[in-house]
């Protein structure tokens, strides 16, 4: 790889300079001027030394500038401090002769350091003491009398610094006290006595014995009502209404229900399910005796067995009696169970006709059409010759006639298709 000279580098393009920097292992993502300088410095060691000297000179000039600016800031601060002290001394009827020297400033700085350390020790002692004692401490320096006439200029400056620091000390002490008190309160209120809380909750709750007693009482009250209902149902016989016959006595012909509704039918499921006997509600219709006959051996001692002696008359009538359930089953027969009736030709011919049959000649089916294509063509030509200057406009009546004819043709085609006449004609 040939190393290009400085003149050749100046003639290079930016892309060539970047490629060269990448080959040499330098950073290529820079501006053109900086990249050219970096390449020259890398290739020529003399230029590198010159760049180093330039950097050192720049650094020294920067340091001198920083030093000068810091001195100027210090002078401005010292001037500001003097003006403040002058104002304070005017208020206290004091005068300052001359500008403070560097020695006096150093003494003030040392005194301030001493006061800071003493203040820090006092703060530690106050923290160890009680908060009441610490609250009383900052009020002591306020009670001291000011010795303005006997104090010198240096002492006055120190006193001013101390006076300016007093409110800061008070604030810090007060904030520490309040923070300590707040922390103590929080820690004391965070842990409640759970034992007392649980005891109060358990006292409010009802005991198990009380709950059982209340439940038993409630059941007794309701069971007595149910027993009364059962007694009434067992002893009292229902009185049939005057205007109507009872349901089991009606013959099959008189009973013609148009539609059986569940509300009108008196259905009792308690016979089938004895466990629901105590849940009977007060119905509008009187309760019927259950047809379920119990055996004399199976009947319990407490229950009375009701039996009706069956006579011959009742046996005869029982055949004619049809209950609503039987009616329902007879009326609703499934199509799968019922067999399809076989067509009997003799029986159908013997029956009288329910319509009047047609007598006489029948009209021919489908009119015989002649080949009138030639005649139609001649008539059409003559018609156009007559009306070539005034063309014939289609009227509504003609349109209606055409539509009516189309409808008739459509109807005939449908009838032919239904009666399979089109197939026979084709054959």
From Swiss-Prot:
Species: Mus musculus (Mouse)
Compositional bias segments (type: Basic residues): 83-96
Source superkingdom: Eukaryota
UniProt protein name: Nucleolar and spindle-associated protein 1
Keywords: Cell cycle, Cell division, Chromosome, Coiled coil, Cytoplasm, Cytoskeleton, DNA-binding, Microtubule, Mitosis, Nucleus, Phosphoprotein, Ubl conjugation
Domain description: The KEN box is required for the FZR1-dependent degradation of this protein subsequent to ubiquitination.
Gene Ontology biological-process annotations: establishment of mitotic spindle localization; mitotic chromosome condensation; mitotic cytokinesis; mitotic sister chromatid segregation; positive regulation of mitotic nuclear division
Residue ranges of the motif KEN box: 369-375
Ranges of biased composition (kind: Low complexity): 119-128
UniProt biased composition (Polar residues): 181-190, 252-264
Bias (Basic and acidic residues) ranges: 43-55, 159-179, 394-419
Location of the region described as Disordered in the Swiss-Prot/TrEMBL record: 41-190, 235-312, 354-427
Modified residues (Phosphothreonine): 191, 250, 323, 334
Function: Microtubule-associated protein with the capacity to bundle and stabilize microtubules. May associate with chromosomes and promote the organization of mitotic spindle microtubules around them.
Coiled coil: 393-425
Assembly, per entry: Interacts with DNA and microtubules. Microtubule bundling is inhibited by IPO7, KPNA2 and KPNB1 while association with DNA is also inhibited by IPO7 and KPNA2.
Span list, region Interaction with microtubules: 243-367
Cellular compartments per GO CC: chromosome; cytoplasm; microtubule; mitotic spindle; nucleolus
Post-translational modification: Ubiquitinated. Ubiquitination by FZR1 may lead to proteasome-dependent degradation of this protein.
Modified residues (Phosphoserine): 139, 246, 261, 337, 348
GO molecular function: DNA binding; microtubule binding
């Amino acid at each position: 790889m040939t190393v290009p000279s400085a003149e050749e580098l100046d003639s290079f393009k930016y892309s060539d300079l970047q490629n060269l920097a990448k080959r040499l292992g330098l950073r290529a993502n820079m501006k053109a001027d900086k990249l050219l300088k970096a390449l020259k410095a890398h290739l020529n060691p003399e230029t590198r030394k010159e760049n180093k000297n330039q950097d050192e000179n720049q650094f020294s000039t920067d340091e001198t500038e920083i030093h000068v600016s810091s001195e100027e800031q210090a002078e401005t601060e010292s001037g500001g401090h003097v003006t403040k002290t002058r104002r304070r001394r005017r208020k206290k009827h004091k005068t300052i002769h001359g500008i403070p020297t560097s020695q006096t400033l150093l003494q003030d700085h040392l005194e301030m350091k001493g006061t800071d350390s003493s203040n820090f020790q006092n703060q530690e002692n106050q923290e160890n003491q009680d908060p009441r004692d610490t609250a009383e401490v900052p009020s002591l320096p306020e009670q001291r009398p000011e010795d303005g006439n006997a104090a010198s200029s240096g002492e006055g400056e120190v006193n001013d610094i101390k006076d300016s620091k007093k409110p800061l000390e008070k604030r810090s002490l007060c904030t520490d006290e309040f923070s300590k008190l707040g922390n103590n309160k929080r820690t004391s209120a965070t842990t409640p006595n759970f034992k007392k809380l649980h005891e109060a909750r358990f006292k409010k709750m009802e005991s198990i014995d009380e709950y059982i007693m209340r439940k038993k009482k409630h059941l007794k009250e309701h069971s007595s009502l149910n027993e009364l209902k059962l007694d009434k149902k067992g002893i009292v016989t229902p009185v049939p209404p005057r205007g109507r016959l009872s349901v089991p006595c009606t013959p099959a012909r008189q009973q013609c229900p148009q539609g059986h509704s569940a509300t009108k039918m008196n259905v009792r499921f308690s016979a089938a399910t004895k466990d629901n006997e105590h849940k009977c509600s007060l119905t509008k219709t009187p309760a019927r005796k259950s047809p379920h006959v119990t055996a004399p051996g199976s009947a319990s001692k407490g229950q009375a067995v009701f039996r009706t002696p069956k006579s011959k008359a009742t046996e005869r009538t029982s055949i004619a009696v049809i209950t609503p359930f039987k009616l329902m089953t007879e009326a609703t027969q499934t199509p799968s169970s019922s067999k399809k009736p076989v067509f009997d030709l003799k029986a159908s011919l013997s029956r009288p006709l329910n319509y009047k049959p047609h007598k006489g000649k029948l009209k021919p089916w489908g009119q015989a059409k002649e080949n009138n294509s030639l005649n139609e063509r001649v008539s059409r030509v003559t018609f156009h010759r007559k009306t070539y200057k005034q063309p014939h406009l289609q009227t509504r009546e003609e349109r209606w006639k055409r539509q009516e004819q189309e409808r008739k043709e459509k109807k005939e085609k449908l009838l032919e298709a239904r009666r399979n006449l089109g197939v026979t004609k084709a054959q």
